[in-house]
């Protein structure tokens, strides 16, 4: 437990803890039937039709990140977060990593909102794809050999997982692509530890405008 919740990676540890608590609560309160649609909805899964009817439930764009559909879904995503989260949190720093994780997940769920409008979606993979793409983008902008090597490894994993998203039924391709798009923009927006000049101020501003504009457009289209 001490190794998992490492003080050197407080945000990764926090997200692991919150997601585990949500999953445990789902398990306890449903007697094991935690993968039912009504249970997922009650705990905050992404569901476009209810947001259109009740716009105040837009919080589902974030809450869905912490909800998982069954043991396999939960375990795979938590193992991924454990390893990816530590690496990315070390590169960006804890505060920026927190925003990267949450905003990538939000963008992924906005893609679900527009491109899979009737889907009930949940899981941390929208955020995880954002982590993948952020490091892949940095790989082509940095001279840091560690980030270059990590980015190349992430690119291979990213391609394998995207192919899996296409071939395996029940996986939200829209959410994965959306998370990756969000992470790519955020990699430009947020300065990396020790490499603040990787992107110019004007490049960061353009990326910020594009990110906010795309999010607003998707929300508008989804509500329409």
Where are the regions a protein language model picked out?
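C-terminal transmembrane module of polytopic alpha-helical membrane proteins
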Residues: 1-11, 162-224
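Helix-boundary and loop/linker segments of multi-pass membrane transporters
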Residues: 4-5, 49-56, 147-150
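N-terminal TM1-TM2 helical hairpin plus the immediately adjacent luminal interfacial "cap"
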Residues: 11-122, 169-171
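Hydrophobic alpha-helical transmembrane segments
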Residues: 12-17, 98-102, 128, 154-155, ...
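Structural signal for membrane-spanning alpha-helices in multi-pass inner-membrane proteins
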Residues: 23-30, 112, 116, 138, ...
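Alpha-helical transmembrane segments that form the membrane-embedded catalytic/substrate-binding core
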Residues: 74-81, 122-134, 172-190
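Membrane-interface helix-boundary motifs at transmembrane edges
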Residues: 88-93, 142-150, 193-202
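Small-residue-rich segments of transmembrane alpha-helices in multi-pass membrane proteins
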Residues: 105-106, 131-135, 155-164, 208-213
């Amino acid at each position: 437990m001490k190794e998992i919740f490492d003080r050197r990676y407080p945000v990764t540890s926090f997200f692991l803890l919150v997601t585990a608590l949500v999953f445990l609560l789902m398990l306890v309160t449903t007697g094991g039937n935690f993968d039912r649609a009504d249970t997922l909805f009650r705990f905050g899964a992404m569901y476009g039709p209810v947001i259109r009817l009740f716009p105040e439930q837009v919080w589902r764009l974030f809450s869905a990140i912490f909800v998982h559909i069954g043991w396999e879904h939960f375990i795979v995503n938590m193992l991924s977060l454990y390893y990816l989260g530590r690496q990315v949190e070390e590169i960006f720093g804890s505060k920026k990593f927190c925003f990267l994780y949450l905003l990538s997940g939000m963008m992924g769920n906005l893609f679900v909102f527009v491109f899979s409008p009737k889907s009930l979606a949940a899981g941390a993979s929208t955020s995880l794809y954002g982590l993948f793409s952020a490091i892949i983008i940095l790989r082509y902008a940095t001279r840091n050999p560690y980030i270059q090597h990590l980015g190349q490894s992430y690119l291979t994993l990213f391609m394998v997982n995207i192919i899996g998203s296409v071939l395996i039924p029940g996986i939200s391709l829209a959410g994965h692509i959306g998370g990756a798009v969000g992470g790519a923009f955020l990699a430009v927006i947020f300065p990396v530890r020790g490499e603040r000049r990787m992107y110019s101020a004007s490049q960061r501003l353009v990326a910020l405008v594009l990110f906010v504009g795309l999010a607003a457009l998707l929300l508008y289209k989804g509500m329409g």
